[in-house]
A protein has these predicted regions:
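Thiol-based oxidoreductase modules, predominantly thioredoxin-like and allied folds used
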Residues: 85-96, 106
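Bacterial signal peptide processing site
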Residues: 31-33
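Low-complexity, Pro/Thr/Ser/Glu-rich flexible segments characteristic
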Residues: 36-52
Length: 188
């Protein structure tokens, strides 16, 4: 028969100490996720790879209001199409618009910024972002879908769809980059 010279209180303290050390080690190991990704670490979806865009160009920071749900829908759409997104919620979103010189009539609910400084305002479908990044027009700064048209990525409402224009942002007047008449024109 096994007998111990230790009291139950001593065993409890030792068990507690060992459990604490083990828990701390486990938490430390789980917390180390490594460096933040700079591009998708997995291969791009074939439909995205066909655009010939360098995966490093698919890293964006999205500036949006913390309470905006439709922006989350657009972020999910972008991530499904190979983009790596970091989201920021500035207290003064209007300062982001001013810093990037986005005219009031070209604004929407969020602004996405690449590391190269290209801006994508609002619910711009990934298809047009990829097309732009593959061959940016001379003098262009980015694209905008002003306002929040129903049926754009993140603004889906059943089968409803409002035609809209994707605007090319330049140092001069914006001009039409794409005229989207049907929801199917948004697909990558």
């Amino acid at each position: 028969m096994f007998t111990s010279s230790r009291t139950p209180q001593q065993i409890s303290r030792r068990t507690l100490l060992l459990a604490s050390i083990g828990s701390a080690s486990l938490l430390t190991a789980c917390a180390d996720e490594g460096p933040a990704p700079t591009a998708k670490e997995t291969s791009l979806p074939a439909k995205v790879a066909d655009y010939g865009v360098d995966p490093a160009q698919l890293v964006m920071t999205v500036y949006k209001d913390a309470s905006c749900g439709c922006c989350g829908g657009w972020v999910a759409h972008a991530e499904d199409n190979g983009f790596t997104i970091t989201t920021e919620h500035p207290e003064a979103l209007h300062e982001v618009w001013e810093r990037h010189d986005i005219a009031l009539d070209m604004q929407s609910c969020h602004l996405s910024l690449t590391s190269d400084g290209d801006v994508f305002v609002g619910h711009v479908p990934a298809r047009f972002v990829l097309k732009y990044l593959a061959d940016p027009p001379k003098g262009a700064r980015g694209l905008s879908v002003p306002a929040m048209p129903v049926g754009t990525p993140g603004m889906e409402q059943d089968d409803e769809f409002d035609p809209y224009k994707v605007m090319l942002l330049t140092d001069d007047e914006p001009r039409v980059f794409a005229d989207v008449r049907k929801a199917s024109q948004q697909r990558t």
